[in-house]
Every structure is written in structure tokens, then in C-alpha cells.
Amino acid sequence: MRTDSRRTHNPFNALMVLVIAGVVFFAIYARQTAHEFLFRPPPVSYERDSSFEYVVADDGVELNVFWEGAGKDAWTVLYLCGSEEDLSMAMPKLRNYQLKGYNVASFEYRGYGFTEGAPNESNLYVDAGLVYDYLLRDKGVSESRLVLHGRSVGGGVATELATSRDPARLILESTFTSVYENLLSLKWIPGDMFENENKASKVGCPVLLIHGEDDGIVDAANSIALRESFEGGNVSFLTVPEAGHRNVDRVGGLAYWTAIEQFVRGSKSGL
């Protein structure tokens, strides 16, 4: 009796191959879509002056850093920009912090402004850590009076930094739970980016969440979910009526700055 050596077709195996191929294809698509959504450098619209310095990364890339000191005992804000924001666009907010007596620092991601290279999630984390350590080492900043303020994608950078360093305060403005969940309404696709909700339990400092009620890019539900994820209950939350994704500080005005002052200093005045 001869045995048929041909393999028996297994529909289940074929189905699994199709499913795996579909997941891989969708993961690649999601990654590309997310990258295009996250990183949109604007044209350079300003000239560097003595307020700007360069911090050199390990691979030789010069990070364009802004620093203005207010005094040794002042609180320091390290501002992490949004996806379409260079230092010139962030300057009104930075100047407001200066007027309120803060040391102010920020930097441009790779591919933004006067920083060369191309941005990705990994090098944003590494570069932010370099600037953070530079402030402690070269500017004499104390972590006990250091505030991380991240807007939009910068909130993801600030959250990661707060898990690996020990800042005194964390402010997240217009920030998402994760990129895939916000952009694609999916959490199961592998390779998600800026998974802030999953990192919340690792943040040990007080947190202030700020969100515009009319944000059509990152819905305010993201900040509501983040509030529930931070442990210990040391979380403040400000929603700004009629504010969208990019104008929360302008629409919020006095209420916005009062909330920040109360959160950082315990002061009752935003002026």
C-alpha cells in the first residue's frame, strides 16, 4: 500500500498566515501614518542669538537649546514642544514663564529649527535626557525645583523623562494616552508609540493635566483617561472651554497661568 507523501492542506494554517501577514502590514501602515502625524517641522522663521546654545549628542548632532536664567533659587521649566512647534513658535509661552520669574529652557527636536537630523521617538527621549542632564550639570538647576512641561507629542517626551529622572512637577498639555489609540482608535497593534497611559504609574511627582475642551486633534478624553492612570491621586486637571489643540494658553489666559502657578508654587495668582 503506497502512502501519499503530499502534504494535506490545512485551512487553519493558511488562515493564520493571512492573519499574521495582515497584522504585520497594518503595523507598518500604522507606524508610517503615526510618524507623519507626529513629526511636521515648520520652516525656520527666526535667527539664533545669544539665548541659544548647542548641546552635542553622542552621535555628534548639535541640539539647538534655548536658555534664559532668572536666578539660582528660581524654579526652572523645561518645555517640550509640540509636533508642529519650533522655538520661535514656543517663545510666547517661554517669555510668559520668564515674566513670572522662572528659569526657562527648551530645545528643538532633530529636524526642527536649527537642529539637524531626523526625529523619531527614541532619539527624542535620548536628546531630552541630555538637555535635562545639561541643565543640572552646567546650569546648576536643582531637580527639586524643576518642572517638565510637555505639549502634545512633547507630553510624551516629558512623561518618559519623568519616569527616568526625578523632576519636581510634570505638566501635560493637550497630551494623548498613546499614539495608536488616539490616531487609529486601536490599542492592539504592536509598535505603539508614546504610550503615556502605560507609563503613568511610574511617574512619582505631582502632575497637572491641561486640555482644551474643543480639541479636534487630541480629544480631551485622553487627559481624562490619563488622570485615572496616574497613581496616588496627586493629579490636578484643568479643562479650557472653547480651546482647541494649539491655543490652550491663549484662550485660557489668566485661568491657564493661575492653574500653573498654583500647581508649581501654591500661589493663588497667575500674574
Sequence positions of predicted segments:
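An N-terminal hydrophobic leader/cap segment in hydrolases
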Residues: 11-57, 64
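Acidic catalytic loop of the alpha/beta-hydrolase fold
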Residues: 214-218, 246-247
